[in-house]
From Swiss-Prot:
One of several proteins that assist in the late maturation steps of the functional core of the 30S ribosomal subunit. Associates with free 30S ribosomal subunits (but not with 30S subunits that are part of 70S ribosomes or polysomes). Required for efficient processing of 16S rRNA. May interact with the 5'-terminal helix region of 16S rRNA. Gene3D superfamilies: 3.30.300.20. One of its GO terms (cellular component) is cytosol. GO terms for molecular function: ribosomal small subunit binding. Its main location: cytoplasm. This is Ribosome-binding factor A. Keywords: Cytoplasm, Ribosome biogenesis. Belongs to the RbfA family. It is found in: Cytoplasm.
Amino acid sequence: MASYKKERLENDIIRLINRTVIHEIYNETVKTGHVTHVKLSDDLLHVTVYLDCYNREQIDRVVGAFNQAKGVFSRVLAHNLYLAKAVQIHFVKDKAIDNAMRIESIINSLKKSKPN
């Protein structure tokens, strides 16, 4: 499959999930989360949705709430994406921000310990 088609589908999935959170989900915990990026498998059967939220302490609750509403998201994706089979959605915590903060703290500690 062409990579541009897969990239277009990933962008459509982000758009559909965000629209569903705004218009169809009434759980406030879900509304605090947002999709950072999406990874679609090569066979178009599995999609990994990376989530983040403003309050980092609640990220596990947000991922759990998204998993509870997985049926709504599956229905929306099945109706709006023209694929042979419905995709299986996997919601996971986006660790990119945590990793960036950890690297920044290491760099700052190295700068402080380095004599000038």
